[in-house]
């Protein structure tokens, strides 16, 4: 069965590849959803494609309606995976895909930067109106946190409550 990696930035692409190497995951699918189309995003996506069985990419946030349709169509193609691994579980795109794709295990990964801010983006679990409209309550960010089975991070200190695997910064940057 396939493993699915949802990435939003070039750094996410590198982290996902580091996870694949460290865990020796086989048969992986990449969904890359950058918010802008530039040379850097295209370059890293092109470099990453060779490590995945199937890849998908779309620039998001240009039209939420088109994005919503794209995510639904994408979920119909992927259907089910063993591991669902998201670089940012809080975004609507990750949670919408998660609600539509059958999976056995939920994993997350981050660079740890959010832990250095006084009021981090990820600490706010209040659901935005768009999430309340499009997602069932069990796919609200606050509900999903307890379902994460494994979390990969660069952050050296206590992170989240789930089983955490620390990635070495150099292994990510050398990907």
Predicted features by range, described:
Residues 4-155:
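Active-site and donor-binding regions of nucleotide-sugar-utilizing enzymes
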Residues 142-175:
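Loop-centered beta-sheet repeat module
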């Amino acid at each position: 069965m396939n493993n699915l990696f949802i990435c939003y930035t070039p750094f996410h692409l590198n982290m996902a590849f580091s996870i694949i190497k460290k865990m020796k995951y086989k048969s992986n699918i990449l969904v890359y959803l950058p918010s802008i189309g530039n040379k850097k995003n295209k370059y890293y996506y092109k470099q990453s494609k060779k490590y995945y069985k199937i890849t998908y990419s779309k620039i998001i946030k240009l039209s939420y309606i088109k994005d919503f349709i794209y995510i639904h169509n994408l979920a119909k193609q992927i259907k089910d995976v063993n591991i669902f691994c998201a670089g940012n579980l809080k975004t609507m795109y990750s949670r919408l895909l998660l609600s539509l794709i059958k999976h056995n295990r939920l994993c997350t990964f981050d660079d740890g930067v959010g832990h250095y801010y006084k009021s981090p983006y990820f600490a706010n679990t209040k659901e935005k109106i768009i999430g309340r409209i499009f997602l069932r309550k069990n796919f609200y960010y606050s509900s999903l946190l307890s379902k994460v089975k494994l979390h990969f991070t660069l952050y050296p200190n206590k992170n989240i409550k789930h089983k955490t695997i620390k990635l070495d910064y150099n292994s990510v940057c050398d990907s």
